[in-house]
A protein has these predicted regions:
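A short, conserved, highly charged catalytic patch centered on acidic carboxylates
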Residues: 2, 13, 20-21, 27-32, ...
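A short beta-strand->alpha-helix segment at the C-terminal rim
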Residues: 167-171
Length: 219
């Protein structure tokens, strides 16, 4: 049996793989705390002001590709997740898959192409650390961004064979960003951060904190 990320929901993942949503996890707490320690430069603040201005002017009519091209992509590029020294990179729509045994001991092939993926590897992804899913509107009629993101995170966790190590994720619905962490069979979702407000600083600091965390994991 097989299931694509686009067909996965939180309910499906909970019922079939025993995943459980909790209020918080050490991985998310540490991520937030590390982000609060980061100070942004004047240049970064100027960049963010430009990105935010474009977002405010266009959020109601941008399609998914335009949102990614003009706002999400530049945000990730400013953090610069390409790191040859620590051997990890940011990839887009690269296929990942694995087989996972469900609660009935049936082997399920989970597969898909996350909108974004940070993993070891330079030319192609190897061991994932972070999965990203983007949705243009707050809620699409088909698909569930949080379910898609979590299913990709579950695949990453299985590939790495380190269930105790936090797997990180993020899904964006329009202007709102949500951060996720999966540890073992427990996962949590942060509050939403509105990129058209001062929350943009929080979002950017979370991305920078993620980079530092991945550098530590790959040292």
């Amino acid at each position: 049996m097989e299931k694509s990320f686009s067909d996965c929901t939180l309910l499906y993942l909970e019922k079939n793989f025993g995943l459980e949503q909790v209020d918080t996890l050490a991985g998310l707490t540490n991520w937030l705390q590390l982000s609060e320690e980061i100070t942004l430069s004047d240049f970064e603040k100027e960049e963010l002001a430009l990105f935010q201005s474009l977002l405010k002017d266009n959020i109601l009519h941008w399609n998914e590709q335009e949102l990614s091209l003009h706002f999400i992509g530049p945000m990730f590029s400013s953090v610069r997740f390409t790191n040859r020294q620590h051997y990890f990179n940011l990839f887009a729509e690269r296929p990942i898959e694995t087989t996972v045994e469900d609660l009935n001991r049936q082997v399920i092939r989970l597969f898909g192409k996350p909108d974004g993926l940070i993993a070891t590897g330079y030319r192609e992804p190897e061991s994932p650390f972070f999965c990203f899913t983007e949705y243009k509107k707050h809620r699409e009629p088909n698909g569930e961004p949080e379910g898609q993101c979590l299913s990709a995170m579950l695949v990453g966790q299985t590939i790495n064979q380190k269930p105790g190590q936090a797997m990180y994720g993020c899904f964006v619905m329009g202007r709102d960003w949500y951060f996720m962490v999966l540890e073992g069979q427990s996962y949590c979702i942060s509050r939403g951060y509105d990129a058209t407000t001062e929350h943009l600083y929080v979002i950017f600091k979370m991305l920078k904190a993620l980079k530092e965390t991945i550098k530590t994991l790959t040292s």
